[in-house]
Amino acid sequence: MDTLFHFYEQLFQIQFAFKARLREDRHLGYLEEKDIDPERLASGIPQVSFDDLRMEASPWIDLYGDIAALLIRDTECLAPDNREPQPETILAQALEIFTSKVPLVGSGQPADVTRTASGLVLAPYLQLACEHLMPRITQSAWHRGHCPVCGGAPSFAVVHAEPDFRTLLCSRCNGEWRFRRMGCPFCMERDHQTYYPTESGDYRLYVCEACRRYLKSLDMQESDSERCLPVETLSTVSMDLAAREKGWLFF
């Protein structure tokens, strides 16, 4: 577990430093003035497209190199046998991952350095876009199981004292949005939902019999303390292991 936390600590430092660089250069600054599209909200279409990230106009290749080196050094990812991939290949991989709406790193997939690093390169761009757009999105206008900013699937949830909704955390841009209290955000099935609380009662594992997916949740019904949800996602990795051992799917 300590090894996992150490890896993500280094990864986040790399990504956050690059995001700070993007912010300083005013990359994606135009999104501050971009209107929230009500038609997209009504149709369930995310506000940001891949082209909106304008990756061609920024030095992301340095970020890719740092992430790839970290993956090769600290994970089971193997260094590619041939020369470094061309920028066009990396962008194509990033586009495919963005369009698929899946988490930036897939679970249960072969350890492919190029694809894994290409996905992780997206994080600073998506997080920066989320910071510009999410505060201006009317939560009551969005009732979907995917993120209104980038279209990502949720990786975590928070159960509040309010009986009608919970908060979902995007697995890609760290955006947070409201979703109904009951029902699966992945397949939208309202029935066949079960949750298993941890011994402490602080967390719940929601599972959907219809699509076999699971979602970790933090029970905040009796607490109003501030919690960092991306950190909560990492600190509950034992729940992921237990769920997958039982055959439940992350996505």
Description of each model-found segment:
Residues 1-134:
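N-terminal alpha-helical interaction blocks
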Residues 11, 122, 147-150, 170, ...:
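Generic structural hydrophobic/aromatic packing signal, biased to beta-strands
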Residues 48, 77-80, 104, 139-143, ...:
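Hydrophobic transmembrane signal anchors and adjacent membrane-proximal interface regions, especially
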Residues 114-132, 139-167, 178-193:
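Short, charged low-complexity linear segments at domain edges
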Residues 157-236:
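Accessory, usually C-terminal, subdomains that scaffold auxiliary metal cofactors
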Residues 229-251:
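Hydrophobic, glycine-enriched assembly/anchoring segments
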